[in-house]
From Swiss-Prot:
InterPro entries registered for this protein in UniProt: Pyridox_Oxase, Pyridox_Oxase_CS, Pyridox_Oxase_N, Pyridoxamine_oxidase_dimer_C, Split_barrel_FMN-bd
Official protein name in the record: Pyridoxine/pyridoxamine 5'-phosphate oxidase
GO molecular function: FMN binding; pyridoxamine phosphate oxidase activity
UniProt catalytic activity: pyridoxamine 5'-phosphate + O2 + H2O = pyridoxal 5'-phosphate + H2O2 + NH4(+); pyridoxine 5'-phosphate + O2 = pyridoxal 5'-phosphate + H2O2
Residue positions binding FMN: 65-70, 80-81, 86-87, 109, 144-145, 189, 199
NCBIfam families noted in UniProt: pdxH, PRK05679.1
List of residues binding substrate: 70, 127, 131, 135, 195-197
SUPFAM superfamilies with a match to the protein in the record: FMN-binding split barrel
GO BP, sorted A to Z: pyridoxine biosynthetic process
Family listed: Belongs to the pyridoxamine 5'-phosphate oxidase family.
Gene (name only): pdxH
Amino acid sequence: MNKILKKILLKNREYSIGSLRKNQLMNNPLDMFKIWLKEAYKSKIPDITAMILGTVDDKNQSYQRMVLLKYIDSKKVIFYTNFKSRKANHIKNNSKVSLLFPWNILDRQVLFLGYAKKIPQDDIKKYFYTRSKNSQISVWASKQSQIIKKRSILDDKFLKLKHEFQKKVVPFPKFWGGYKINISSAEFWQGRKNRLHDRFIYKKIHSKWNIYRLSP
């Protein structure tokens, strides 16, 4: 093994920024998440709304990718994507998904499990037109998850559409939209010294959230 690679793989550190106690937790995991999200924002962590979305295909092969959190309330979170994408095809066959927020700078991570469902088109349309015009055009320029021969094909298509819609409203793409994830489980992880981390899991039983400490 290369010496530099070996050094990288053997490198570790102590997690000593904070701790997490049960009496600090909110009754609802999404309310707790909002607190941590605000603290992540104050810490100036880049891309705090980036979350790793996990899905499974029809052969039980798991996939992960980054998507952006765009809405949250006490029951659900929402993200947007192309309905012809790989992730959308997975969700069509299996609505069970996972969401992971890795906030390493704070020695924290949050894991959500839940079920994905398309949101109403009126809500999708409303959000679509809050995006920048270039972002609206990019939806039309990219056939997401499809193989392309070279980058210039994508760039040329974007520039062509940008010119076409220079003085026009970009049409709403019916093949694009949002998913709400109804949360069924949530785990909060806070790194601690000696790898004795704090972990708490929320499980919904009979419409009520129950909180349990997990061994690290």
